[in-house]
Amino acid sequence: MEVDMQRITIDPITRLEGHGKIEIFLDADGNVANTYFQIPELRGFEQFCVGRPVEEMPVLTGRICGVCPEAHHMAAAKACDAVYHVDPPRTAKKLRELLYSAFYVTDHTTHFYALGGPDFVMGPDAPVAERNILGVIHKVGLEIGGKVIQARKAGHTVIEMIGGRKVHPCTSIPGGLSKGITREQRDEIEKLGRWAVEFAQFSLKLFGDLVLGNPAYV
């Protein structure tokens, strides 16, 4: 981090996937006048898509990210629906929604415990050397660290059942999905979902205690 009398530069940002920097400009009184979030890298995915069949977009655009490919996969699938003027059947909509809910489990777990946790859980006054995932696990306990891994595994298991792969799903097509799920998979998804809800409720309470209950943040 670089600091002068009128500008603070944080480069690189370490609490997200990818590269970025923040520049904060101060006025004469030292108050924030403007803040800019910048992504200095060029990905070029828009150019990859030019000239390709529209049906390839849900698979191709998912490669934008290895942490949130489901978001890009689903956005492209819904764009394909619009291109073809089709409304997916109710079952396909429910399965897509279920896949996205599983993505919520993995993504929110990652962000709260691994990316945001080093700051939110450890607190702004914690030593820099302790503001990492190991520091978070030390504070919340090894048992909770195991549940974090279990939550990500549960989400990825459901994503694989519906999306075809644990990372970079490939089953959404214009008008629906290219595959369904079996009765056994449905029962397993229900079991994993109930466990994930319990873990989410625990995580919300932890957030309330450690973050909302910290006067430095609220």
Place the predicted regions along the sequence by residue.
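Active-site bordering "gate/hinge" segments
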Residues: M1-V218
